[in-house]
Amino acid sequence: MDLAKGEWRDKSPDRILFGKSSLSPTLRQHLALQITYREKIARKYPSLSSLFLPEGITYEQSSGEATARYKAETFAPSPFLVDGTGGLGIDFSHLARGAQRAIYLERNEDFATAAQYNIPRIMGESYSPARIEIQQGSLLDELERLVQNGMEMLYFDPARRAQGGARTYALADTEPSPIEVCHTLQRLDYQGRILIKVSPMEDIKEVLRQLPSVGEVHIVQSSDEVKELLLYIPTLSTQSEATPPSLIAVQLSPEGLVVNRFCGTPAEESEHPHHFASALGHYLLLPGAALQKSGLFHSIGITYNAIPLHPNSHIYTTDQKPSHFLGKCYEVVRVIPAKSSELKRLNQVYPEADFSQRNFPLKPVDFYKKTKIRPGSSHRLIGTTLLSGESVIIEAH
């Protein structure tokens, strides 16, 4: 039964809850919740409008279809996959398509019950009850059994809310703790792979310090935002055995295809010389969110044959336009000193403009107020600071 369609499609949650109906109070509550979530479901899961969302699901933490497809393309297949924090089942359903055997494990009974309804609908023809198992239980409690049964890949997405409901981003405070899970698996002599989804707010350096076995950090950008950090552990190791990790920044299309990709390592970053531009080239490069999150700012310059303008600007310049850049590339038209006298008459040349800034004394709202320029798309202006300390406004297109 699709609760968000049919005769209930155009009714408000309040009318469903309090209007006349033959539905039971329990079913009314479930139906009102589905109607409330309907627009969010359509936006985040455009091909999955019939999903049933149980009350209490951490909707904002659930993966979208694009990032779920990326995980499946990058880390599948597996002979025996376990999703230890099943949740809504989006990631599980995509990863399980390439698995010979797959277990969805969820500690919350309502979520596990909803998964019985959702997963066959998400997986479609690739769903097979002979190889797909939906179980209720705690990952930490079940680890020993799963390892003994031959688990080859473990995926989990720790809850980022403390018991009181407040958000938490520290690895040790998420549930289950990736640190505790990895320690337990080491004790059990687990030889398989691990994939952990953590908050985009995590400090990558701190994560690598706490989890030395991480071989790859995937920084996944979709719709100009970093949506996920994925920690890939090909095999558990000690601090002394660990190999230098790779940081992989990717930009996804709405369909989950990789549009742009960048790869570097903290070890390489420390070896690159620190050069800064003395003058602007023909093009201006503004790294996207995933590139910025990597923190590999000198490696970015080497990869794209570009030079940063300033240590704190994270804007690059080059005379050669890169064929594939994970960010925005503009042609430099004009450079204007950000002096008070110039700002006062700027609206005579640019009555309307789209203004953005990095390492610039004026925020956009203050810039528009001071210059009396109207926000719009007629011109593109970028405020920044050069290595000399001079603040400038760059017209670009």
Where in this protein do the model-derived segments appear?
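SAM-dependent transferase fold signal centered on methyltransferase-like domains
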Residues: M1-H397
